[in-house]
A protein has these predicted regions:
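Alpha-helical transmembrane segments of multi-pass integral membrane proteins
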Residues: 3-14, 73, 155, 277-414
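Physicochemical signature of membrane-embedded alpha-helices that form the seven-helix bundle of GPCRs
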Residues: 43, 72-82, 233, 237-240, ...
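Alpha-helical transmembrane segments in multipass membrane proteins, preferentially the mid-helix core
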Residues: 165-172, 247-260, 320-335
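Aromatic-enriched alpha-helical transmembrane segments of multi-pass intramembrane proteins
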Residues: 147-152, 173-307, 362-363, 381-384, ...
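Membrane-cytosol interface segments of multi-pass membrane proteins
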Residues: 1-196, 202-203, 211-222, 346, ...
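Short glycine-rich loop/turn motifs that provide flexible caps or phosphate-binding loops at active sites
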Residues: 90, 248, 343
Length: 436
């Protein structure tokens, strides 16, 4: 049996990062700063690393060296857990800032949304250049839509329109709303509308055209680009299965002291309960998979909504359980180190740029349809294959980190050129959803 090099290194690195610089509360006491700006920055860094590990765990299994990345299987089904952390921290930070900063909503969208929009278009330039270099075949209308963001050239960039929608909903909800209950309800409904649209539309516009057009052999791939799977906004469960964490974050910030007092009583019992809830919700998802209940049933001719709604309900339970687990755990221990700090300060850019190195190095290594096919018969877990996969992993991480620094630098420079963009808060926000 071949020694699992990838597993040892990846999971060992995670363990080291979680332990190095960890802030541990003394016996009988609790961390008071586990949801401070510094702490949540490091939490975002952890989430950014989790997302790229999720994407690294998803290569096609074609009998080549990339199969060794299957040792990261643990991350394959939980990518949205890490994205949920981004939404949770964003919702938490907004409510905290609203409560502590005078006139926080003044120029809110300009301060919070504009840097994200600039970052999106800076990112898009890199992907445009990459696809031009590859000679990607797209119609003029598809190019125009993807250049301007009406459709996405980078599938991972779905986070940008969703977080902008959430920020806009937050601004509308709290701008003139004297009742916080109604404001919270408005934000919840904004999330529900996004969920509702996905449950109706699913992964492509099945309703656009003659009834059942998509069931004909090859029809999906012969259709105009905008009718093909995951071509437009909200065509995919990843658009909606973690956004509820934004609302959870708002609730946590609004009830911060009550939650702290509640969880400090019988902390161990509640922590164990959160662990069991995470395990049970994950097991329930696996059970649904076993019963052929999942998001992609339309590709086998079943367009009913109920199976997706069931799976989304379980995903929502998973997000709640995961956030609860993280929240309770961090009351006792949270991690602070240079890696998480760097990733936390570049979380949006790191998230947006990772798809480019993932694809580019798979081509350079000959593991993609755009490069040489892997030779048949290569050992799936041989040492040579594992070392090749490990080199790929390191190069992807390094290139993504470098690109994130470049994109953040360019974003800040462009924002600085905009009229009246000299406030310190605006400069802090220029890297994404970092500043409170």
């Amino acid at each position: 049996m071949t020694f699992p090099i990838i597993s040892i290194i990846v999971y060992g690195a995670w363990l080291a990062l979680l332990l190095v610089g960890s802030r541990r509360a003394k016996l009988g006491s609790f961390n008071q700063d586990f949801m401070s700006l510094e702490a949540t920055k490091n939490l975002q860094g952890l989430a950014a690393l989790g997302v790229i590990c999720h994407h690294l765990s998803q290569p096609p299994q074609n009998g080549g060296p990339m199969d060794a990345l299957g040792q990261m299987q643990f991350f394959r089904e939980i990518g949205f857990w890490f994205v949920a952390i981004f939404f949770f921290v964003s919702g938490f930070g907004l409510i905290k800032s609203l409560a502590t900063k005078p006139d926080y909503l003044k120029k809110f969208l300009r301060r919070r949304v504009l840097p994200i929009v600039v970052c999106f278009y800076v990112m898009n330039l890199f992907y445009i250049a990459f696809h031009l270099f590859l000679g990607t075949n797209m119609s003029a209308s598809e190019w125009v839509c993807k250049i301007f963001g009406i459709a996405l050239l980078n599938d991972n960039a779905w986070f940008v329109p969703v977080i902008i929608i959430m920020y806009a909903a937050f601004k509308l909800a709290f701008k003139n709303e004297s009742s916080k209950a109604r404001a919270f309800l408005f934000v919840f409904l904004a999330i529900a509308l996004q969920v509702g649209w996905f449950l109706f539309n699913k992964h492509f516009t099945w309703w656009w055209g003659e009834p059942g057009w998509w069931k004909k052999p090859g029809a999906l791939w012969l259709a105009p680009w905008y009718k093909r799977p995951v071509a437009l906004w909200f065509e995919g469960e990843w658009w909606v299965n973690s956004t509820i964490a934004f609302f959870f974050g708002m609730l946590a910030a609004q009830n911060e002291k009550k939650l702290f007092d509640f969880f400090t009583r019988a902390w161990l019992v509640k922590f164990i309960a959160s662990v069991l809830l995470v395990a049970a919700s994950f097991a329930l998802k696996i059970y649904l998979y076993g019963k052929n209940i999942h998001y992609w049933l339309e590709f086998s001719g079943d367009n009913s909504t109920l199976p997706r709604a069931l799976m989304l309900s379980v995903d929502t339970l998973q997000v709640f359980a995961w956030i609860l687990f993280v929240y309770i755990l961090r009351m006792k221990i949270w991690s602070k180190n240079k890696v998480f700090e760097f990733l936390g300060n570049h979380s949006l850019e790191f998230y947006l740029m990772q798809a480019l190195p993932l694809r580019a190095f798979s081509i350079l290594f000959g593991w993609s349809d755009k490069g040489f096919r892997a030779k048949e018969g290569l050992a799936l877990s041989g040492y040579k294959d594992q070392l090749s996969a490990l080199l790929y992993l390191v190069l992807v991480l390094a290139a993504t980190a470098l690109l994130s620094v470049i994109v953040k630098f360019l974003t800040k420079k462009i924002c600085a050129l905009l009229p009246n963009w000299n406030s310190s808060q605006g400069q802090k926000a220029a890297g994404g959803q970092d500043a409170r």
